Swiss-Prot record:
Record-annotated disulphide pairs: none
Keyword Repressor annotated: no
Domain of life assignment: Eukaryota
Protein name: U8-lycotoxin-Ls1h
GO cellular component: extracellular region
Length: 77
């Protein structure tokens, strides 16, 4: 009886560790994907870069995207 309980506890521990590891290995966000709600989820060669949105001089929110590290984007007219 003790062996059955011990085996059950060991199996439960193994399954719990596998689930935790799967949560930690979630897929990263590719380039140009929105990362406003998850700034740390961009792939390793990307950074979550945020920009403020303004309308008539008043701030209306912000947008964040996974972009290449070290690249500067400029607005074209």
């Amino acid at each position: 009886m003790k062996l059955i309980i011990f085996t059950g506890l060991v199996l439960f521990a193994i399954v719990s560790l596998i689930e935790v590891q799967a949560d930690n290995e979630r897929a990263c966000l590719p380039q140009y994907q929105v990362c406003t709600d998850a700034p740390g989820n961009c792939c390793s060669n990307l950074v979550c870069d945020c920009y403020g949105r303004y309308k008539s001089g008043a701030r209306r929110g912000r947008n964040c995207f996974c972009l290449q590290k070290g690249v500067i984007y400029k607005r074209e007219n």
